[in-house]
Amino acid sequence: MRESGVTLLELLVTLTIVMVLASVALPLSRVSAKRSHEIEFRQHLRNMRAAIDTFKMEWNRDGDVLLGPLCVKNKLSCKDVSSIYGYPKSLEMLLGVKLTSEEATVRGTTIRRYLRNLPLDPLTGKADWQFRCYKDAPNASSWCGDDVYDVMTASQEMALDGTKYRDW
């Protein structure tokens, strides 16, 4: 005669199956979370680098020779916002540059923005980006402070593909 109920053996088998499934799912969720941080990080890098490139195109100069269209039209502020190579002097310059020419009235605004805000580094959780100057070596560990030619993370971690995030 069989009684309805759960035996100890059935409970142990069920518990073992649940533990095996959980041990497989946990590493997959960690990899998935890291991958989503990498995607967000890569997008922030693209946005900031595109903003730097647009700034360079508009405020380009070679020493005292003004080359970029906004640099030519805003001679008074050109040397204040761009380095001798035409790159922004700081990352904050990408948040807004005050236009001094008549173009400000044509555009209807006196501020030219390249970024809406400075994004947080998803790898560190802070806006602690590190920079590289135009004249710095590609593997430079310190920033010269003259301009912002490139941005990188402060994180020393390795990516899922085995490269360092700093090298992205």
Describe each model-derived feature in a short phrase.
Residues 1, 19, 31, 84, ...:
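Short, flexible active-site loop motifs that bind/organize anionic cofactors or intermediates
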Residues 2-29:
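N-terminal single-pass transmembrane signal-anchor helix
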Residues 17-19, 26, 34, 108-111:
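Preference for short coil/turn "hinge" residues that link or interrupt alpha-helices
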Residues 31, 35-38, 80-84:
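Short, charged/polar micro-motifs that form catalytic or ligand-binding hotspots
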Residues 34-61:
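Membrane-proximal N-terminal amphipathic helix
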Residues 54-168:
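Low-complexity, acidic interaction segments enriched in glycine
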